[in-house]
From Swiss-Prot:
Annotated catalysed reactions: thymidine + ATP = dTMP + ADP + H(+)
Cross-referenced InterPro entries: Herpes_TK (IPR001889), P-loop_NTPase (IPR027417)
Record family assignment: Belongs to the herpesviridae thymidine kinase family.
Entry's EC annotation: 2.7.1.21
Gene3D superfamilies referenced in this protein's UniProt entry, alphabetically: P-loop containing nucleotide triphosphate hydrolases
Binding sites annotated in the UniProt record for substrate: 192
Name this protein carries in UniProt: Thymidine kinase
Protein purpose: Catalyzes the transfer of the gamma-phospho group of ATP to thymidine to generate dTMP in the salvage pathway of pyrimidine synthesis. The dTMP serves as a substrate for DNA polymerase during viral DNA replication. Allows the virus to be reactivated and to grow in non-proliferative cells lacking a high concentration of phosphorylated nucleic acid precursors.
Amino acid sequence: MAEPARALRVVRIYLDGAHGLGKTTTGRALAAASTAGEGVLFFPEPMAYWRTMFGTDALSGILAASARCAAASHGSARARRAGAPRRRGRGGPGCVLPGQVRGPVLNFARARVRAAAPPGPAPGGTVTLVFDRHPVAACLCYPFARYCLREINAEDLLMLAAAMPPEAPGANLVVCTLPPAEQQRRLAARARPGDRADAGFLVAVRNAYALLVNTCAFLRAGGDGATAGTRWSGRTQMHWPRSQTPVVMNAKCAGAGLRDTLFAALKCRELYPGGGTGLPAVHAWALDALAGRLAALEVFVLDVSAAPDACAAAVLDMRPAMQAACADGAAGATLATLARQFALEMAGEATAGPRGL
């Protein structure tokens, strides 16, 4: 009888944050840091998918629709409706990919009634999967920024947030940050066509990620999305402002209060039909689903002001504190093939698998 493959420890890291910070550069530096037995697989942002796979440049269409909304007196209803399908489409690759990765990781775990990996080294070694963005970017943070600018309504935002796929055990989100002036400088230097760099939008995106970090801290500390929903009576509206005031990020990811979260920011009249005081059940269910997805994330914050190699080293230094999952040792080759295929089709580039897999 063939000897079973030794258990492989799988650490999944999603690099996320506002655009123009240097996430992709940090991800590539992480991939270059692969060593024997400690491979790093990089899943880049799917630029080729958005720009070439459908015969039209979908990314340019999304950005153009966004610009039209911004120019049309904070977004007319017609412009918002026209842009919604494109916004949902942008999340496609990121929403599908977790399911492909989940297969080889969780099939082994289910067979042993164990999903999370125990602490310490695994017999089959460790593989780190690094993703350039989590679905939370397309499904929540960027739509939320546009909601704050009154370019989309709360209904669209809730619909997009509810579409975020559930996470398998072992997901770690590293939210990248930069001082605003340095972000502007890097955006100008990369000069990507269609990049939206107006100050109001950048503040809104940074606020979205700050609230995301605070929300995850609130949930991990025992905060309950359902409780948050029931506390939203019409008489206790929090009136979180759709303003340009920067939100303070709970950088240590410690406990945060309800008022510092996305739940407070979504306390709005639009979700209460007819001016009622009770939150409709369907909205409460959507918010509870969102809370469940966010609670599964272990969140870290990283200032990426340093050189890419230093940022990559900082991420690797976070790994002992990160959650992990188990896979059969044979899954390493499957994951390496998946990473190569994704990089080739979604980013238009070939990438070699890491050493040690």
